[in-house]
Amino acid sequence: TSLKPNAAPPIAAAACGCFTMLYATMRSELKLQLEMFMRIVLIPLCAAGKNKASTAANGASSNSSDGFNSETQRIALETVVDLCRQPHFVTDCYMHFDCDLSKACVFEELVSTLSASAFPANGAKLSGANVLSVEGLLAIVRTVSRSTTAESSSASSPLGGDSSMLLGESSGMKAAPSTATNGFADDGSMQNDEEEEGDSPAALRDELRGLDPWEYVKASAAPSGIARARGLRKSRALKRRLVVAAEHFNRSPKKGIPYMQEYGLLPENLSAKAVAKFLKLAPGLDKEVVGEYLGDPKDFQVEVLKEYADLFNFENVTLDKALRTFLDGFKLPGEAQKISRILEVYAVRYYGANPNSCADADSAYVLSYSIIMLNTDAHNKQVKKKMTLEQFIRNNRGTNGGKDWPKETLVAIFDSIVTDEIRLTDDAAPKLSNSAWHDVMRACEVGEGKFDAPPDEFESRQYDADVFSLVWAPTAAAVAVIFERATDEDVLESSVEAFVAVARIASNHRMTDVVDHLVATMCAFVTKGAQSAVEINLLRPGVALGEDIKTRSAAKAAFAVANAHGDDLRRGWC
């Protein structure tokens, strides 16, 4: 099972250390394992402390089982920092997950979690977890910074000194309680300025050239180099469009389908096969909405359900494992007739793939329905008296074409269902189970578990702007909190250097809004510090600026950025 937030620190440390070592030595073989480890273990552990703080802020008491939360979170965050320092980790996550239509956006999830964990709870002092979260964000920025430094002749710090100090370690940071007013969201959430609605419908239709999104991505793929970078950028843009389309479908399938047709994501002459492929492969779909759509008795929806079932390969897979896979993409509706209709189609598909496994499709249907009933009985807390193995066997007597099922088949199914629940709820959080691990192993056996060749230095630079656009806002926000709450001069200087580094990367990629935002943030600190000193000590602004080290540091950073990157300042001059 996956590590829980209150897992004993030695166990968490051993698991995280083991995986870090495996990734460092066997990277090319661990694509699917990395995705599972990040989404099921590491990211939830990093977020555990934030969830606990939110509970405490809402007045809920914490029990003793939460005692290991902070230490386990620290171990997880240290593991993230170590992984982010690996040469290919950031690009691996971005290229192979965020740019893959069939995968979760692991890199974006990681950045969001680090961003949220970097901000202390209301009124709380800066903790070690907050600082480690900032270090994780800076480690990602450092990856981009190396490429920027390599291709830029002006790699030296505008403040002087070694440019490598711009993103130096911040473990020595100290904090004093204060109220953050840094111009960013208080919860550390990313303020993504990118417009999700991007291209016009006509432009996207022309780009797709009649192909569905998955055929288009396959046609645009390349093994390496600039061609691969271009293909992945197209895939990433298309994935965002699919997420928007999924949101429309989640609100109203009736309106969502015309929206997708308008953008060329579904053909004008709507086919059940195209809709089924969208329902199976598109990211961001609400499983409950998908289940209701597939269970609809209308003729077109029934055809979609049949096409949906045909997208699965059930050959040489046991009935219960195939059923798990089939039900993974949607939530079974609550209405008995809809459940029956879905299981009937599943049974026909399963029997077609495994004609020697049972007498006929009706037999597969009856056993499938019995499995659903067993699953509900075994895992519903309201059911006090659980079904026994003998009762399960008795319930299925004579249902295999009038004959009994082999006892070993029913025993194996019973044990599998009782020990490993088929999740029938719309649970967005990924879970580790025997069946999920079995799916990973099957995918590895057919060659789907390997990373592509790592990008060379030139190709890697092609992803820098995209990675930086995701990470700059939470990094700047987190560093601003560190800057505001710090009392140590070295910490202030490190924070300033980090700001300047982010500005340098933004300038290199001509992200003028980012440079404007950074300068405005530093100027806000200058104004606040000067006004506070004047009000408290009745000093003139010039004297106040000279006596307050934090205000001086902020002014120094603002002028350094303006001096070095003035060509990329727009509103920041005002």
What do the PLM-derived regions correspond to, one by one?
Residues 18, 22, 33, 37, ...:
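Structural recognition of alpha-solenoid helical scaffolds
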Residues 5-12, 51-59, 114-121, 167-177, ...:
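Charged/polar, low-hydrophobicity segments characteristic of intrinsically disordered regions
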Residues 15-26, 41-46, 76-88, 118, ...:
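Hydrophobic residues within the alpha-helices of tandem HEAT/HEAT-like
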Residues 1-7, 22, 31-54, 83, ...:
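Amphipathic alpha-helical segments within extended alpha-helical solenoids and repeat-rich scaffolds
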Residues 1, 17-29, 63, 67, ...:
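Boundary/linker elements of alpha-helical solenoid repeat scaffolds
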Residues 4-16, 26, 30-35, 51-55, ...:
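Helix-start/N-cap signature of alpha-helical segments
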Residues 184-188, 192-349, 376-463:
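Catalytic and GAP-homology cores of small GTPase regulators
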Residues 141-150, 568:
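Extended alpha-helical scaffold segments
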